[in-house]
């Protein structure tokens, strides 16, 4: 069974794409578990009318030890973060930078979800900003790409992407800002002019992208059993 929902925008709000102010951001973490892992770096770039108007970046001192595997991936060591602010200390700067602008992340279900869990952990409400997942948007806009990692999408738009600098929050946020600017151009070229339009877009190759979900089906009688075998 394939999940038909391809959510691009969370916390939907009407906003014109033509003069959109957005914040692209990225996190580096000690791992993938929102319950057990911590943020080690935050990076964000703010764009208005296609031009950068601000950026923010900081290493974050996690409570958890950074493993060698994560250091190999992000190039962030335990020594790098020993004098960095904790996430509790840095949260006010993140929220001040976001304001109420649209935020963009590549695989927002992870980055926004992780950040929301951290906010709740320290007594803050979850983000109410419209949050755009550029990964899901790429599925819809660029159905013929062979891969949808940020580097693949950047190279499609001829935006330089250095694999050695990848997996650093400030670098990925900067690349994502350029990618999303190009996506906005493509959206308007295709007749989409508002943030609210993105969720309504079709995903041509949905069956190739979304992982199948496990489902249990109960047949109550022989007729149901016969019909069930027609599904598989």
Per-region residue spans from a language model:
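Conserved non-catalytic scaffold segment of RNase H-like nuclease domains
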Residues: 1-128, 143-157, 162-163, 167
